[in-house]
Design a protein with these regions (language model features):
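Predominantly extracellular/luminal carbohydrate-interaction, adhesion, and secreted-enzyme modules
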Residues: 1-214
Length: 214
């Protein structure tokens, strides 16, 4: 059992690192996480030069969970800007290989756009990912992962993708419960809005695939 209190934003600036794992409670969890609550907003951004940052995993509770993650809640908004080529982000967990059950997310999960337009003064700050797996509970549920509950595994936070890198290879997998689902999902509830209004980071016509679930 553990709790992080709100009031400040956990801000991570990634300048180098092929992979990064960021969570309100723990970055990478090999063991079990039980009865934890995160109340801190989480904001991550990265250096997109070359492969300085390729994979960014982020979750309100855990960035990556290999063991069981149960009975936990997230109340802190998650935001990813100028992010790595891959962003895997969820209200509870970025990517899960184990059992995730009886979890609740009430916070927003977003990849925001440039408020000044795609070619505005803040263009570099809002340079989006090429591949986005984003969900209200889990960004990615791996093939050995299980997400379940008795109606008490819920998401009520909005999931929003506003910015992607311009590329014909861009893929957006977004859902109120899970972004990319490879494992088993059962008895989960989503009441949060899911919105994809992505613009290319540079001008021109955007070409990307959208896969929605939940």
């Amino acid at each position: 059992n553990c709790t992080t209190e709100g009031g400040k934003t956990i801000a991570l600036q990634i300048t180098a690192g092929y992979m990064s794992y960021t969570g309100g409670i723990v970055g990478w969890a090999d063991g079990s996480v039980t009865g934890c609550t995160n109340k801190q907003p989480l904001s991550i951004s990265a250096n997109r030069l070359g492969d300085a940052c390729r994979y960014a995993y982020a979750g309100g509770v855990a960035g990556k969970s290999v063991g069981a993650l149960t009975g936990s809640k997230n109340r802190g908004n998650l935001t990813a800007t100028a992010i790595c080529k891959f962003v895997i982000m969820g209200g509870i967990v970025g990517s899960a290989d184990g059992v995730v059950s009886d979890v609740v997310n009430v916070a927003a999960v977003s990849v925001p756009g440039n408020p000044d337009g795609v070619n505005g003064a803040l263009k570099e700050k809002y340079f989006g990912p090429r591949y986005a797996y984003v969900g209200g509970i889990a960004g990615q549920l791996r093939i050995d992962g299980t997400l379940t509950g008795n109606g008490d595994t819920t998401n009520s936070g909005a999931v929003t993708i506003e910015q992607m890198e311009y590329s014909t290879e861009d893929i957006v997998a977004v859902g109120g419960v899970v972004g990319q689902q490879l494992g088993k999902v059962s008895n989960t509830v989503n009441s949060g809005a899911v919105t994809v209004s992505a613009s290319p980071a540079a001008g021109g016509t955007i070409a990307w695939k959208v896969r929605c679930a939940g």
